Structures are given as C-alpha cells and as structure tokens.
C-alpha cells in the first residue's frame, strides 16, 4: 500500500489488483459465470451451487449475479481460509460493492453462506478430507482438483452429502475454480 501511495503521489496512474482478483471488478467474472449457469439451468435444474471460497471474489460474484439476474439458486461456499463469520463478512462486503457497481438490489448479509468445517490445519495446508476428495474424483472421473481451493470445496460437498443436506432429487452444481497445476507442489501429501 505504501508503494502504491508513493507512486500515486508522483503522478502514476495505478490500479491495484488484490489477491485472487477479489474486488468488485474481479467479481464480475463470476457474475457472468452465473449468467452461463442460468442458461444451462433450463436443461439441468440446479438446486444448489457449491464451491471453495477464500479471497471472496467467486462467491461474491455468484451472489451479486443472483441479484442482478434475479436467480434463486442457493450458493454455498466452503471456506478454505477463514472461520465462517470472517468469510461471510468478506464475501458480503465484496458482493455489496459488486451489486453497487451493477446498480442492482443489494443482497442481505443473511444471503451469504459459508462453511468452515473443511479448512483443515490452515490455508494451503492439506487436510485428510481434501486428500480423500481429490483422490476420489481423480480415480472416478479423471478430474484433478487443486489442494488449496477446489479440493477442500469438494471435500465440503462430500461432507454435505454424508450429512444428508441434499435429497435424491437435488441436482447440485460444483464449481471447479482451477488450480490443478499446484498439485505437483503437494506431491508429498499424497504419498502418505
């Protein structure tokens, strides 16, 4: 922040991109993602959207998109970094700014849902649930999850299924946010 302030004071035109691109501009990508989901929903009738949430941009964009497109599909984030309250606060603040940018209705804080049961030992640190989820999806579907976001998000989805949070008639969409390239950095964790 000091460097940015110094550069601006010297006349530089600076645009700071936060970690994960998680601000109202970055969240617009997931507003558009929700637009695509709505189009596909005519065919699939999704009853829930689940994804890993950390820096907040993905979930904020999806939630702002719900307001912008008047969509009622529930969105649940599986926190990979912060406790439930902190994560929900971060998502709400980013989603609120995104709604303001879109000039649409502002969501209520109660519309933000994040679970924190699948963080494990910490951000970027493997958990047993993540390892099991990542191995399962690779083995059954040949889909690679990253250990930091999607792996923990998918572990959360499996946990929700085990906890009977869905019915047989539910059609749940899991959003894989990428990052599988980081798997090689976690080779040691999968050898246990």
Model-derived regions: residue spans:
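Short glycine-centered, acidic/aromatic-flanked micro-motifs in structured strand/loop junctions
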Residues: 19, 80, 116, 147, ...
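General structural feature for long, well-ordered alpha-helical segments within catalytic domains
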Residues: 3, 26-29, 33, 58, ...
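Conserved beta-strand elements of the Class I
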Residues: 15, 50, 171-173
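Structural signal for hydrophobic packing residues in well-ordered secondary-structure cores
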Residues: 4-8, 38-41, 66, 95-102, ...
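Active-site-adjacent helical/loop segments in soluble small-molecule enzymes
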Residues: 109-168
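Glycine-rich phosphate/pyrophosphate-binding loop at beta-loop-alpha junctions
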Residues: 27-113, 175-192
